[in-house]
Amino acid sequence: MEEDYQQPRFTIGRQSSMAPEKIPEPSVHSEEEVFEDGEEIDGGVRLMYLANEGDIEGIKELIDSGIDANYRDIDDRTALHVAACQGLKDVVELLLDRKAEVDPKDRWGSTPFADAIFYKNIDVIKILEIHGAKHPMAPMHVKTAREVPEYEINPSELDFTQSKEITKGTYCMAMWRGIQVAVKKLDDEVLSDDDQVRKFHDELALLQRLRHPNIVQFLGAVTQSNPMMIVTEYLPRGDLRELLKRKGQLKPATAVRYALDIARGMSYLHEIKGDPIIHRDLEPSNILRDDSGHLKVADFGVSKLVTVKEDKPFTCQDISCRYIAPEVFTSEEYDTKADVFSFALIVQEMIEGRMPFAEKEDSEASEAYAGKHRPLFKAPSKNYPHGLKTLIEECWHEKPAKRPTFREIIKRLESILHHMGHKRQWRMRPLTCFQNFEHKKKHNWDLSSHDGSSSGSHL
C-alpha cells in the first residue's frame, strides 16, 4: 500500500508576514544544495524555489511545461507569496502575467500584498495595487458594528477624482458629501510600522478633542479599511508659508492680527481640559488661512502631551528644524514653552519678510538657537509696533521658564493692537481738523464775497 502523499513545505527565504515564527533569511543556496541527489522534486516547490532566486527564465520554462502558477505548498503559500516577500518585482510581474491569483491567502491569512507591506517592498506593493490587490485589514479594525467609532467615514463617500496635493504633501483635497475636505492618508508602506500606526492613532485621538475657531476642524476618519485616513476641513487659501513667499513682509497690523490668531489657537491647546497639548511642529506651513482671512493651527501628527523627555536622539525627519526650540533639538525635557519659542520665530518672520537664519540650512539654524544665537532684527524700527520686539525676545528666551504663556502673549498683543489703532486715530484727527478748517475758511470767504457783491448791487 502506497503512503499518502505529503504536501511539501517551502521554508527558504522570508516567510509569511503572519506566521507565528518567521524563519530568518538563510544564505543563498544552489538548487543542488537544496534538493538531494536522486530526490524527486515537486514541480510546484521548484517553482517557489526559482521565484525565491529570481530565476525568470527558469520560471517561464516551468510554467510553459504545465506547472500551475498558483501551486500551493502545505502552508497554502504560492510562488507569488515568495516573490512578494523577497521584493522581486520582475518575478511578481511575470507570475501575474501568467495568471497567478493576485490575492491568495496562506494558512495564516496573509496575502502577497500583506507580505510586501510587512517587508516594506515598495515596488512590489505598487505592482500588486495596479493588478487590484486588496488592502489587508486596517490595524485599527474592530470586530463588531457597535465598536465602530462615531467619526468613521465610509471611504466610498470620498471622491478623489479632482484631488490635489496640499500642505507639504501630507494632505490632499477631496470631495465628501458635496464639500471640499482635506484628507491625510497613512501610506501603505507604513501600515506594518507599529510606531507610525501609533502616531496616526494618537493624532486621531487628539483631533477629536479639539474645538476652537483657530484650530483646523476635524470631520472624521477612515479606520476600518485601508488606506486609513483623517478628514479635516479644507482651507483653500493655503498656508502662511505660501503667503510669506508671495508677499514677503506683512503690514505690521496684519502681522499682529495673525499673531493673535496663532496665539489664541495655541493657548487653547496648552490649556485644554485634561492634558495640555504641545504642538511641537509650529511653523508657517502648519498654519492655514480661512476665507475670512484668519489663521488656523493645523497638523498635529507629532504633537505631544504635557511635559516630554524624548527617549531617543532628535532628528529632523518628522518636523522642521528651523522653528524648533533648543531644548527639543538637544533632546532635553521640554513643555508648552517649546511652542512659544517657535511662535516668536514666526512673528519675527512676518515682520522681516524672510525665514529665521535664511542663509543657513534647517539643522544649522537649530544649532544656532542651541548656541544662544537668535535671528537679527533687520527691518526698520517703524515696522515693529511698540512692545512687539520686546515680546519676541521674551518668547525666544534661552530659559523656557522665562518665556510667557500664550495667555499672557494674547494680552500683550491685544494691547499692542489697541495702541496701534489709537495711534492711527491720533494721526487722522489733525488731518480731519485741518480739512474742516479749510472747509470753514472757504465757506466764510464765499459768504464774504457774496456780501460784498450784494452791497455793490444796492449802490
From Swiss-Prot:
Which positions form S-S bridges?
A: none
Q: Which InterPro entries match?
A: Ankyrin_rpt (IPR002110), Ankyrin_rpt-contain_sf (IPR036770), Kinase-like_dom_sf (IPR011009), Prot_kinase_dom (IPR000719), Ser-Thr/Tyr_kinase_cat_dom (IPR001245), Ser/Thr_Kinases-Pseudokinases (IPR051681)
Region feature Disordered, mapped onto this chain: 1-30
GO terms classed as biological process: integrin-mediated signaling pathway; regulation of stomatal movement; response to blue light
Q: Which family is it part of?
A: Belongs to the protein kinase superfamily. Ser/Thr protein kinase family.
Q: Does the keyword rRNA-binding apply?
A: no
Q: What is the protein name given in its UniProt record?
A: Serine/threonine-protein kinase 12
Any idea where the Protein kinase domain is?
102-417
The UniProt entry's GO CC annotations, sorted and at most eight, read:
cytoplasm; cytosol; nucleus
Instruction: Report the gene name.
Output: BHP
Q: What class of enzyme is it?
A: transferase
Description of the deletion phenotype: Impaired stomatal opening and plasma membrane-type ATPases (AHA1 and AHA2) phosphorylation in response to blue light in guard cells.
In the UniProt entry, which residues are flagged as the active site?
A: 281 (proton acceptor)
Q: Which Gene3D superfamilies match?
A: Ankyrin repeat-containing domain, Phosphorylase Kinase, domain 1, Transferase(Phosphotransferase) domain 1
Subunit note: Interacts with BLUS1, PHOT1 and PHOT2.
Organism of derivation: Arabidopsis thaliana
Pfam hit, one: PK_Tyr_Ser-Thr
Q: EC number(s) for this protein?
A: 2.7.11.1
Record's keyword terms, sorted: ANK repeat, ATP-binding, Cytoplasm, Integrin, Kinase, Nucleotide-binding, Repeat, Transferase
Reading the lineage from the top rank, the first entry is Eukaryota
**Which PROSITE patterns does the UniProt entry name for this protein?**
ANK_REP_REGION, ANK_REPEAT, PROTEIN_KINASE_DOM
Q: In which tissues is it expressed?
A: Accumulates in leaves, stems, petioles and roots, especially in guard cells.
Q: Name where it's found.
A: Cytoplasm, Cytosol
Q: Which positions does UniProt annotate for ATP binding? A: 108-116, 184
